[in-house]
Structure formats: structure tokens, C-alpha cells
Amino acid sequence: MLGLCLHQVRYAAQDIPAAKSARARGSYLRVSFKNTRETAQAINGMKLQRALAFLENVKNKTEVVPFRRYAGSIGRTAQGKQWGVSKARWPVKSAQFLLDLLKNAEANADTKGLDTGNLIVKHIQVNQAPKGRRRTYRAHGRINPYMTNPCHIELILTEGEETVQKAPQVVKKEGAHLSSRQRGAQIRRALIEA
């Protein structure tokens, strides 16, 4: 025995069964924590193929990542309208790192025998890693810190559940709590369809 110490890596999401899911993680990745967190939030809950296409589009700047939490001093773009925000960016490096992790998780799912065409991003989390410390030299002999903000990423893919159609009487009961504006829109829609 070479003295190898294999231990179970802990994921933040404990309630997802390992048999029906595929996991991937990256540690101490040299990519911006804030950009990666916003990009990860954008793909959370997406189907795998849609998430891969979205990240490719972000790299090509045809789709945009909405910035909600870390949105200070961020410029506005019209592409953010599809997410209902004005502040949005195209974090290419974060998109590439997440693409690589998604492809790794997809390969893990294929190895486990899961249906790769039916996978969704069930859990994705970005944590801060220890900051890299360098220095930059300023005027008058001063020195300022020149920090990097790397991150750890973990994600879990699961097979999507089949959606069951609600019974018509249940759908009608839900309509009881509509505002007058929603009821009016519903009536207009019914008139247009008739």
C-alpha cells in the first residue's frame, strides 16, 4: 500500500441521492469569484444541453449573464431584458470554467449510466478560495496589494422528473386568487382565442 488516503468529498447539498446524480467540482480555480457566482446562478436549474448552449452563447456574446448581487458599477446592456435586468455582462473566462465542469459532470453521468439527454443542473455553488496576494508598486515608493479572488465550484446534475399535468378543477381553483388586472388579461386572452 502506498499510503493513499481516499476520502469522501463533501458537497453542500446533502439530500440529493448519489445513485441518481452526477457530480463535478473544481478547487482553487483562478477565475473571478464574483463573475463565476453570477454565471452559476444564471444556469442553476437549467437543462444540461440548454446550460451548455447558454455558456457557449455567453462566450460568443450573443447571450448575457445577469448581474444581481455583485452589480456595483456595472454597465447596462439591452441584452439583459431577457432576464428582467439592465446590468449584465459576458464573463468569458467564468463561462469557460463552468463549461469544462459541466462537460466533466456529463461524462460522470454517462459513466454512471444516467440518461444524459434528460439531465438538469440541480445544484451549483461557488465558494471563495484563499486570495492570491501579490504587490504593485505605486508613486512615491508606496506598495499596494494586487489580489486575486479565486473560487471553488461544485455542481450536481440529476435526471429531470416528468411533469404531471394538473387536473382541470385544480387549475380553476388557482384562478380564484387573481388580481383584477390578471383576470382582465385572462378574459382578453380567452376572447382572442375564441
Swiss-Prot record:
Belongs to the universal ribosomal protein uL22 family. Keywords: Ribonucleoprotein, Ribosomal protein. It comes from Aspergillus fumigatus (strain ATCC MYA-4609 / CBS 101355 / FGSC A1100 / Af293) (Neosartorya fumigata). It comes from the Eukaryota. One of its GO terms (biological process) is cytoplasmic translation. Signal peptide: none annotated. One of its GO terms (molecular function) is structural constituent of ribosome. InterPro entries: Ribosomal_uL22 (IPR001063), Ribosomal_uL22_CS (IPR018260), Ribosomal_uL22_euk/arc (IPR005721), Ribosomal_uL22_sf (IPR036394). The keyword Hydrolase does not apply. This is Large ribosomal subunit protein uL22. Pfam families: Ribosomal_L22. One of its GO terms (cellular component) is cytosolic large ribosomal subunit.
